């Protein structure tokens, strides 16, 4: 049996042959929301197809005398389907779509699923001896099967089954034509389809929990890696400050004293300039490894100093817009993200200008870092993570663990990264 480290010690369960950690509710909700948004979008597209099938069923399978009320019903459903489609894709960027989806909760998808049940059941009731409208109702379990909540799916499927029974029993022409044995068989077949859809939802729910568990484990491992890296950086910074930097400062002081005794020696002047440059570089290195200013005066000045030193070193024009007058427990996380993003701008973007904005909105720390370089997307970062580059991915994991979000936003040129974190005072 392989060892899973903290996962095994903290407790977990096997799902699909994988040991999954007992996932936090926040991580589970995050993954469930993402899956629910995906399912909601798929269902909104399928609804358009259902509208087309309803029109076809009306034309080939119902009497012309029933068309007026059916057209009205199909028209209402078409409007609802288009509305659902617009809501599902109203935000072109996944971040804002997901945030809107979180704010609306579970009511919107449930409401449209209820509309599906009512409209398709009504369509069958308006169709005398219509086998095709009855076949359209088979699509209901398919739409419900895209859900990720077993309880909600069970309620909807039960209502769907009742609607199917009402539609069949409410058509006396069909009852006389097929008789009770075939009616019972059709009901049993539909019940089987509903049960199958419920099992699919259950499997999807378990899959969601598995993904959430693995995501939480990955975040934990990345956070541990970052913590170890920060400890190492602090030790290196202290070693540089207490060792080489002090030696350089001492040597520079001796040269200053020598220059006072024997002024005018150009070699001494060049040595002093070199030692001055070396001491500044060492101070900058210790600042980036362990920013004392972050502990002394706060995140805002630390970010401003980091941007200024990065601009001076790289030649990139970096503007700052900082309105962050408080201190918070998330400050080290935010500073680490800024440091990593500016490092990526210098190393990979080829940008000539960049901007850093830091502020507070709705009790959240909001960070925006943008540049005019070659551009980086979330897919690019995922590929780099697969290649072993965990820098930004580890910071994203820490942001997620703190209840925040780090996303790449669409921009005509360059890269735009937005970070939101709830404040911890």
Swiss-Prot record:
Pfam families: HATPase_c. It is an enzyme of class 2 (transferase). Its EC number is 2.7.13.3. It is found in: Cell membrane. Residues 224-425 form the Histidine kinase domain. Keywords: Cell membrane, Kinase, Membrane, Phosphoprotein, Transferase, Transmembrane, Transmembrane helix, Two-component regulatory system. Autophosphorylated on His-241. One of its GO terms (molecular function) is protein histidine kinase activity. Its main location: membrane. The keyword Amino-acid biosynthesis does not apply. GO terms for biological process: phosphorelay signal transduction system. The modification Phosphohistidine is found at residue 241. It is a multi-pass membrane protein. The chain crosses the membrane at residues 42-62, 71-91, 107-127, 130-150, 155-175, 181-201. One of its GO terms (cellular component) is plasma membrane. It catalyses: ATP + protein L-histidine = ADP + protein N-phospho-L-histidine. Gene3D superfamilies: Histidine kinase-like ATPase, C-terminal domain. PANTHER family: NITRATE/NITRITE SENSOR PROTEIN NARX-RELATED, SENSOR HISTIDINE KINASE NARS. Member of the two-component regulatory system NarS/NarL involved in gene expression during aerobic nitrate metabolism. Plays therefore a crucial role in anaerobic survival of mycobacteria in host. Functions as a sensor protein kinase which is autophosphorylated at a histidine residue and transfers its phosphate group to the conserved aspartic acid residue in the regulatory domain of NarL. In turn, NarL binds to the upstream promoter regions of target genes to regulate their expression during aerobic nitrate metabolism. This is Sensor histidine kinase NarS. It comes from Mycobacterium tuberculosis (strain ATCC 25618 / H37Rv). The lineage of its organism: Bacteria, Bacillati, Actinomycetota, Actinomycetes, Mycobacteriales.
């Amino acid at each position: 049996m392989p060892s899973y480290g903290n996962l095994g010690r903290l407790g977990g369960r096997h799902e699909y042959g994988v040991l999954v950690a007992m996932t936090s509710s926040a991580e589970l909700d995050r993954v469930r929301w993402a899956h629910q948004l995906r399912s909601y979008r798929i269902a909104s597209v399928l609804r358009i197809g259902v509208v087309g099938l309803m029109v076809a069923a009306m034309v080939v399978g119902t009497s012309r005398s029933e068309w007026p009320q059916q057209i009205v019903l199909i028209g209402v459903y078409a409007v609802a389907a288009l509305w659902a489609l617009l809501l599902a894709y109203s935000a072109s960027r996944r971040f804002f779509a997901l945030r809107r989806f979180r704010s609306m909760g579970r009511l919107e998808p449930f409401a449209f699923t209820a509309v599906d049940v009512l409209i398709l059941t009504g369509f069958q009731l308006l169709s005398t001896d219509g086998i095709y409208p009855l076949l359209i109702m088979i699509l209901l379990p398919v739409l419900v099967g895209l859900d990720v909540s077993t309880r909600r799916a069970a309620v909807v499927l039960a209502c769907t089954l009742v609607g199917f029974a009402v539609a069949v029993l409410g058509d006396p022409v069909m009852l006389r034509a097929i008789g009770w044995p075939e009616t019972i068989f059709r009901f049993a077949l539909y019940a089987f389809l509903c049960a199958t859809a419920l099992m699919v939802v259950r499997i999807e729910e378990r899959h969601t929990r598995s993904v959430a568990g693995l995501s939480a484990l990955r975040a934990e491992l990345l956070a541990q890696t970052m913590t170890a890296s920060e400890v190492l950086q602090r030790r290196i910074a202290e070693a540089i400050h207490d060792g080489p930097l002090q030696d350089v400062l001492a040597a520079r002081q001796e040269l200053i004293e020598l220059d006072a005794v024997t002024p005018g020696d150009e070699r001494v002047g060049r040595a002093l300039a070199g030692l001055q440059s070396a001491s500044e570089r060492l101070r900058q290195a210790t600042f980036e490894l362990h920013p004392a200013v972050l502990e002394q005066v706060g995140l805002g000045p630390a970010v401003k100093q980091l941007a200024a030193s990065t601009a001076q070193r790289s030649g990139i024009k970096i503007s700052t817009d900082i309105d962050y007058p408080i201190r918070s427990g998330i400050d080290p996380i935010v500073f680490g993200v800024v440091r990593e993003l500016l490092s990526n701008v210098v190393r990979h973007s080829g940008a000539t200008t960049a901007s850093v904005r830091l502020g507070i909105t709705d009790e959240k720390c909001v960070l925006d870092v943008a540049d005019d370089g070659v551009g980086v997307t979330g897919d690019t970062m995922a590929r780099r993570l697969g290649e072993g580059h965990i820098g930004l991915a580890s910071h994203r994991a820490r942001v997620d663990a703190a209840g925040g979000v780090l996303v790449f936003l669409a921009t005509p040129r360059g890269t735009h990264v937005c970070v939101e974190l709830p404040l911890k005072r």
